[in-house]
Amino acid sequence: MLAYALHLRAKPKCVLLFGLFVYLLADLSSAAEFRVGLVLDRGGKDDKSFNSSAYQGAMDAKQKLGVFVKYVEASDDNAFEPLIRSFAQKDFDLIIGIGFAQKEAIGKVARQFPKRQFAIIDAQIDEPNVRSLLFEEHEGAYLVGAIAALTSKTGKIGFVGGMDIPLIRRFAMGYEAGAKAINPQITVLANYAGVTSEAWNNPPKGKELALSQYDSGADIVFAAAGASGLGVFDAAEERKKFVIGVDANQDWMKPGLVLTSMLKRVDQAVFSIIEEARNGKFSGGVKRFGLANKGIDYSVDEFNAKILTESVRTRAESIKAEIVSGKIKVPDFYKKQ
């Protein structure tokens, strides 16, 4: 009887010890979890373009690789450094800056936290703990420019850029070169939403510029303008003209009016650097994404299959192959400066 009583009195302690063991094990598991901090640019995760693609890549990594992901959206350019620093101070394993505007902030914080791992999209930072993820946007722009010229009935097409900077000029130059390779007489109208970071998040301005181009005779407009591009899509719907999307596959947004999207696989870049870092294979340096490794491409799906004709697709595939082989040399604004 006494032994039984002692057993009953001892049981709660066993339960408590077991519970403590489980708690400590869970805590250790949480501490061992690979943590990713994602700093989005001004357009935010709902821009349906550049930032949305980056966010999707991180969410894919969360689901497929089991990493922890926390994302933040910058309210203005001054917010980048504090957000990046906060992730570094909280011992996040990998911190990713989305967009060239974060170059200075990522570089500064990376130097102050040399044991942390960083990555940045669209900028090159020469630090051993920073991976620079760069894209050959001019290749994709050339390709969709050719597609636009092959499709246009008016001999006039348009381009609406976001912030007037070398990166977007690179899109514009490639687009015009691709179009004129098909039709040397084609007219390419080009406008930009502004010269400050506000230009990425101004749909009304994007719509105004696109309407002006459509009303001037353009029957296709390529939008490379972040969230401002949403206004270009609205203009296309209003005028019943074609639009070309950018970064993410935007064909679904206005079915039957989106001729194609120039795919800039930011999602692929974000996923790949998270996977490398999680597997202990992170290194600094530069990784480039272009047509050759499918980091750049154009879209074909159920939303544009009927308007992107088979003959145009066949020609586009031929042009793509010639760019990859080097037979076609695409002009690069970065090298023209």
Identify the function of each model-found stretch:
Residues 32-337:
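A residue-level marker of the well-folded mature domains of exported/periplasmic proteins
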Residues 5, 15-17, 251:
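Short amphipathic alpha-helical "recognition" segments used for binding
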Residues 10-14, 321:
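Hydrophobic alpha-helical segments, especially transmembrane helices
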Residues 1-10:
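N-terminal secretory signal peptides that target proteins for export/translocation
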Residues 13-27:
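Bacterial N-terminal signal peptides
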